[in-house]
Amino acid sequence: MLEVYLGVGMFTAIVLVLVLVILFAKSKLVASGDIIIGINGDADKAITTGAGGKLLSVLADNGIFVSSACGGGGSCGQCRVNIKSGGGDILPTELDHISKGEARGGCRLSCQVNVKSDMEIELDEEIFGIKKWECDVISNDNKATFIKELKLQIPDGESVPFRAGGYIQIEAPAHHVKYADFDVPAKYRGDWEHFGFFKLESKVDEETIRAYSMANYPEEFGIIMLNVRIATPPPRNLSLPCGKMSSYIWSLKAGDKVTISGPFGEFFAKDTDAEMVFIGGGAGMAPMRSHLFDQLKRLKSKRKMSFWYGARSKREMFYVEDFDGLAAENENFQWHVALSDPQAEDEWTGYTGFIHNVLYENYLRDHDAPEDCEFYMCGPPMMNAAVISMLKDLGVEDENILLDDFGG
């Protein structure tokens, strides 16, 4: 009997020791209680929060919206903050976006920083002007086979003080979207049916945030206008996931409510007299339209400028009347379209081929000084890479190549 008692006692003692070890480790490794996040050395900006969560989310919960085009996934590298103390060691996931020198200076991706202890951070003052709005959908119309123009109404008495080339972030709740419910006009449905896209569904169990560039310019007041390309899986493997945000946006109808935050941006025009060359493709049309309308309508710029847009066929061209009007009203502006796959019904007599080749063969090859021009581009990744390679071969420096890189 004594042996039984001794055995039970030893087992109980071991369990108690293990519990004490776990509690001690937890006290050292897991933060508890209130945490203070000091911001810019300003006591009025400090945040008191509980332990846990990512710094990006904690800041957003307290009305401070740091840019994150990927919605906190660690892939865009935009949600940078400078951490003066606290925050722990930089993670391998951050090193693709932050150099060793930047890391030594305290640069971190806020979406990767766990809030576990008091910290001091520095933010750009512009961040404190970023706000959140609940907007009404005015319209959501196809402009091309796979591109919709989403037009949002800003609440009465409010404005989004953005600059041309800027962007907003849009929020999508958890959702289940059936592509069969999309409003796709008859002239675009052929490709959708051919590829089997109407069979697709998008099921998302958590909130999603993504960034989109404005297609409107600052003096188109009271609205936000976006060009959104649907992100489908490749036709040969429709079992792959659909684009979370684009599926949600394509499901929106007039009168629906949408939450956005902003404005953000870095893709701004330089204040010089240099010639401006704009190159776009697909939904990369959005910042091109914003920039050109801003330059020619608001600023009344006399700088020489041209716009080169690549599309697959005539059916994929949009805002044609807008740019024809700008060209008619401004002798310093021309625009050109190249079709990579014109159809017989297009009766197309304009440029054909890929836009980087067309731009080179028909303009830059004989240009006196292409290295003195400023090049603004936004389009599919392959287009961007081809244009940049061509410009480098012409001797254009990095400082004159400006890219809105959201993957087209």
Swiss-Prot record:
**UniProt topology in membrane:** Single-pass membrane protein
Listed transmembrane segments: 4-24
Please give the cofactor(s) recorded in the UniProt entry for this protein.
[2Fe-2S] cluster; FAD
Where does the UniProt annotation locate this protein? Cell inner membrane
Q: Which reaction does it catalyse?
A: a ubiquinone + n Na(+)(in) + NADH + H(+) = a ubiquinol + n Na(+)(out) + NAD(+)
What keywords appear on the UniProt entry? 2Fe-2S, Cell inner membrane, Cell membrane, FAD, Flavoprotein, Ion transport, Iron, Iron-sulfur, Membrane, Metal-binding, NAD, Sodium, Sodium transport, Translocase, Transmembrane, Transmembrane helix, Transport, Ubiquinone
Biological-process GO terms, alphabetical = sodium ion transport
Q: Which InterPro entries match?
A: 2Fe-2S_ferredoxin-like_sf (IPR036010), 2Fe-2S_ferredoxin-type (IPR001041), Beta-grasp_dom_sf (IPR012675), Cbr1-like_FAD-bd_dom (IPR008333), FAD-bd_FR_type (IPR017927), Flavoprot_Pyr_Nucl_cyt_Rdtase (IPR001709), FNR_nucleotide-bd (IPR039261), NqrF (IPR010205)
Q: Which branch of life, at top level?
A: Bacteria
Question: According to the UniProt record, what class of enzyme is this?
Answer: translocase
GO terms assigned for molecular function: 2 iron, 2 sulfur cluster binding; electron transfer activity; metal ion binding; oxidoreductase activity, acting on NAD(P)H, quinone or similar compound as acceptor
- 2Fe-2S ferredoxin-type domain segment(s): 33-127
| Name of a matching Pfam family | FAD_binding_6
Subunit relationships: Composed of six subunits; NqrA, NqrB, NqrC, NqrD, NqrE and NqrF.
Function of the protein:
NQR complex catalyzes the reduction of ubiquinone-1 to ubiquinol by two successive reactions, coupled with the transport of Na(+) ions from the cytoplasm to the periplasm. The first step is catalyzed by NqrF, which accepts electrons from NADH and reduces ubiquinone-1 to ubisemiquinone by a one-electron transfer pathway.
Which HAMAP family would you find in this protein's record?
NqrF (MF_00430)
Name by which UniProt lists this protein: Na(+)-translocating NADH-quinone reductase subunit F
Q: Which organism is it from?
A: Shewanella denitrificans (strain OS217 / ATCC BAA-1090 / DSM 15013)
Question: Gene name on record?
Answer: nqrF
